[in-house]
């Protein structure tokens, strides 16, 4: 079954510059006949070496409400939660001729409404972000099974040993500081840690 369609060449393929490099931007969306929540978005491919340098994905806005159960693991009886928008941005950076994951950000927007109340809805925006501080390819091994968590785990139900002193002054990153500057400072902190 063909889930995705490409539009006319003018709509699908564009060119843009990312990190001083020319990239081809390829847009994709699901076929009109498909009525389930699939992803749509853009892939940013380096024009010179065909490497994927960035991707922007989102649940098709027309069907994002149907995807609510994908993101809500446990529901309460008092509240109704509906997905409004789900967007992911992933970027890759070249290091020693190989592209590695550099930055991930996910933005999830929900409408939250108290059941049996007419005018009680509000918006909830939750997001996550990960930035690669250091790439180390020496002696890389997979995580052991006991070190992995099931994908459906609810973090607030999990008991972790948290070292409040580990991050030191970086425990909270101020909004006004640029993320790249903070990562540089944080990288030097990580370099000091002995294993």
What function would you assign to each model-found segment?
Residues 19-20:
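Short acidic/glycine-enriched loop/turn segments that link adjacent beta-strands
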Residues 8-9, 97, 148, 167:
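Short linear sequence elements within intrinsically disordered, low-complexity coil regions
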Residues 2-9, 13:
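Single conserved hydrophobic/aromatic residue that forms the stacking wall/gate
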Residues 11, 23-138:
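Gly/Pro-enriched, hydrophobic low-complexity segments
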Residues 107-195:
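Secretory-pathway-linked proteins and extracytosolic
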